[in-house]
From Swiss-Prot:
Protein name according to UniProt: Large ribosomal subunit protein bL21
Assigned protein family: Belongs to the bacterial ribosomal protein bL21 family.
Keyword Nucleus: no
Superkingdom assignment: Bacteria
A Gene Ontology molecular function term of the record: rRNA binding
Listed GO CC annotations: cytoplasm; ribonucleoprotein complex; ribosome
Source organism of this protein record: Ligilactobacillus salivarius (strain UCC118) (Lactobacillus salivarius)
Role: This protein binds to 23S rRNA in the presence of protein L20.
Gene Ontology process terms (BP): translation
Pfam families associated with the record: Ribosomal_L21p
PROSITE patterns: RIBOSOMAL_L21
Keywords: Ribonucleoprotein, Ribosomal protein, RNA-binding, rRNA-binding
Gene designation per UniProt: rplU
Subunit-structure text: Part of the 50S ribosomal subunit. Contacts protein L20.
Length: 102
């Protein structure tokens, strides 16, 4: 059985036991989180939500909070001695999918 959930402005296909990276969630390591915005549930019985499947949830455990690799941006104006270097590290949450309840 698999499901498509919506979190952090993205839609992700998940299965039980899978490890995924999502946008930062307000939870500590070891906490249980529930995703209730389930768009689609597939398997023996397929259910498509309008826009979400009623009563369907995906349970997960937070494994790690972290920050992604640094993305460096560099802008410059030729012949003007003007340049800007800036870096950004996006925070993420690593979760393990425990169960899909549909």
């Amino acid at each position: 059985m698999y499901a498509i959930i919506k979190t952090g402005g993205k839609q992700l296909k998940v299965e039980a036991g899978q490890t995924i990276y999502v946008e930062k969630l307000d939870a500590k390591e070891g906490d249980k989180v529930t995703f209730d915005k389930v768009v689609f549930v597939g398997g023996d019985k397929t259910v498509i939500g309008t826009p979400f499947v009623e009563g369907a949830t995906v349970e997960a455990t937070v494994e790690k909070q972290g920050r992604a690799k640094k993305v460096v941006t560099f802008k410059y104006k030729p012949k003007k001695h003007q340049h800007t270097k800036q870096g950004h590290r996006q925070p993420y949450t690593k979760v393990v999918i425990d169960a899909i309840n549909a």
